[in-house]
């Protein structure tokens, strides 16, 4: 973890490198605030599985997967710093013993039936270059 000043300097250096060398950077972090400031696209992963993908603004303003929604709701609100942070419920399963079906099903509050616990969801195109792997959105694809 970097202090805020060093973090800002490192991010500025990365942006300069991207501009100077016309390249991209894969930035791996849990800090969605930094993602919002620095990235054009975001891939949200859970237990090694891609669960949501799209332009940063679209995913942060309109998160679709319950895990992404939980991450967004866990961010501190600048207009109410006294408010308790919301945690994503449940315990993280072992990556060596992933749950069957959707990898998030043991922590999900939006289970839609047996499919969530038996079948891994496919990515569904929601438009605006935004995809989600969640059985909630299965109807969109059909």
Residue positions per predicted region:
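Short catalytic/signature loops enriched in Gly
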Residues: 55-142
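P-loop NTP-binding/switch modules centered on Walker-like glycine-rich loops
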Residues: 2, 6-84
């Amino acid at each position: 973890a970097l202090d805020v000043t060093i973090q800002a300097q490192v991010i500025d250096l990365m942006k300069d490198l991207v501009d100077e060398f016309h390249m991209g950077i894969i930035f791996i972090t849990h800090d969605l605030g930094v993602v919002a400031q620095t990235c054009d696209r975001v891939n949200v992963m859970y237990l090694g599985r891609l669960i949501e993908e799209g332009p940063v603004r679209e995913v942060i303003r309109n998160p679709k997967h319950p895990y992404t929604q939980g991450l967004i709701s866990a961010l501190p609100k600048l207009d109410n710093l006294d408010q308790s942070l919301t945690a994503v419920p449940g315990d993280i399963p072992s990556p060596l013993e992933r749950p069957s079906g959707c990898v998030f099903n043991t922590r999900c509050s939006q289970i839609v039936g047996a499919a969530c616990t038996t079948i891994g969801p496919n990515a569904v195109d929601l438009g605006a270059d935004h995809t989600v792997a969640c059985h909630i959105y299965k109807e969109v694809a059909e």
